[in-house]
Amino acid sequence: IPGADDTPLNAYTVKPGSFDEDRPHAVLMYVYGGPGSQTVTDQWGGRRMLWFQYLAETYNVVVVSVDNRGTGGRGKAFQDIPYRDLGTPEAADQIAAAQSLADSSWVDADRIGIWGWSYGGYMTLMSMLTGDGPSTFTSGLAVAPVTDWRFYDTIYTERYMSTPQNNEAGYERGAPLNYADQMADTQDLIIVHGDYDDNVHFQNSVQMVDALQEANKQFQFMMYPGRNHGIYGGNTRLHLFTMLTDFIEESLIEEEPIIGATD
């Protein structure tokens, strides 16, 4: 799939068994996108892939994942593109990929969502709120997102961004907090965070919630008390993925679920 600068980007799709290339489908893009990472690999995707297959078979959604510039497996020059500019080129690639998909006969351009966790939650917000994102993505699900790199640990952040004193413009440009007012009234957004998150601190989502409220944007927010970055424990995961599935159904799906798929 072509990125923002027409660089070919690695991608995978999870399609329903009844896939028809002449029928428009809703698309859910799964993103991580962080430096040196990969979601597109020649291996089984684990439990998350089971959820993607469930969504595809139950709701006729096509799940797509794209490795933007800055991810791994493509050489140092490719990985170094977001240096001192985290979030900007990566989000531009996700937006460009979504727009390219929108031109396909099997995609309903009015039903393209994006979701991710941690750096992927950050990418979800950046992709929804910057550039052409507000007119490209119908919905977004941001789990444990970074919302300002000043809130994240220095060992990771300064490796890619230098310090705020030496790269103020990069920090400002890469903060979803600064784009809260760009959220379109037609977009649906849910933010999820555990308040004991010791990786991406809960402060990130609190500040994002405050910015969205200040901009009078309507959205959903779920906090998991006593849960860390993985949002595990008790009935938490069942509640989380039931909620995410319901949100996808409400924001992206037009037809009834396939009979028997949820049994």
Kindly give the residue locations of the regions a language model identified:
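Serine-hydrolase catalytic core recognition
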Residues: 1-263
